[in-house]
Amino acid sequence: MRGYRTGLRFFWTVLLSAGFTVGAHAQEVGPASGSLVIVGGGLRDEEIIERFLQLAGGPDAPIVVIPTAGSSERYDQYSPGLRQFREAGATQLTVLHTRDRDEANSDAFVAPLREARGVWFGGGRQWRLADSYLNTKVHEGLRALLERGGVIGGTSAGATIQGSYLVRGDTRTNTIMMGDHEEGLAFLRNVAIDQHLLKRNRQFDLIEVVEAHSDLLGIGVDENTAIVVRGDMFEVIGQSYVAIYDHSRQLGPGGRYYLLAPGDRYNLRTRQAYRLTMSVEPFERIKQEPWPER
C-alpha cells in the first residue's frame, strides 16, 4: 500500500508539472470545481460509495438522493436507493423527486440542494431526469453545488445524465442510442456516457454515436465500476473496465475503442490515457489517427 501511495504521489507530481493542471483555468470538459462519480450500474463495490461520501465531506455530510429516473411516481425516506448510503454510515439523507417541471423551478423544492454537499442520481431511464430537471432551478442548483466544491454521483441512468449528449434517451426503448431526448445535464461537456457496458454487451453501441458526432468523446462504464472526475482528469475505480471512444484516435489498425482498467487515469482535455507506473507516457498502441470510414 505504501508503494502504491508513493507511486500515486509521483504520478500526480509529474502530471501537474507537465501542465495538466486541475485548476479552473485549464478546464474545457470537466467541472471547474467539485467532483463527479459516474458509475456504470450494478453497484456493489463499497469503495465507490465510500469515495463519494469522502468527496462530500464524510458520512455526516448532507446528501440529496434523486431517484427520478425510476418508474415509481412517489419516493420517500424509505426508498431502496438509500440503503447503500445508510449501510456506509451516511446520516443526513434527503430524497428529492418530482415529475413536475414547475415544482422543479420552485425555490422551496430546490432548498435542500443549497445545503447539500453531495447529490446522487439513481438508475432507471435517463430521459425522465431530463424531462424533470433539465434547464430548471434544480439544474442551476446542481451546478452551484459543484461550484462550491461538492460532488455529484450517479449510477446507470444517473451516470448517463451527467454527459452533455444523452444516449439511450428515447422514451420508447433504451436500445435506441440517438432518440427523442439527446441533451443531458452537461457536467461533462462534449461527452456521451453509456453504462452496463460489458455486462450487457454494449461495447459497440457508442460507435454509431461518435461516428455521427465525431467531436463527441464517448465513455462507456461497465457495472460495479466508476470514473471519479476532478477537473479534466478522471480515475477508474471498481471492479471492471471503462471504454473510450475518440474519433481522433484508434487502437491499432481500425480499433474504435480501447479499455481502461481500475487505477488508470484519463485526461479529458488532451484525450490521453495514463497507467500508474513510473512514467506518464500514453498507452503505446493508441494512435492519433481518425477512424477509417466504413
Where are these regions (language model features)?
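N-terminal secretory signal peptides that target proteins for export/translocation
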Residues: 1-6
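Portal/gating segments that form or line small-molecule/metal binding sites
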Residues: 72-115, 128
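C-terminal and late-domain segments of enzyme folds
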Residues: 27-59, 70, 74-79, 84-92, ...
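Catalytic-core regions built around general acid/base machinery
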Residues: 112-115, 135-149
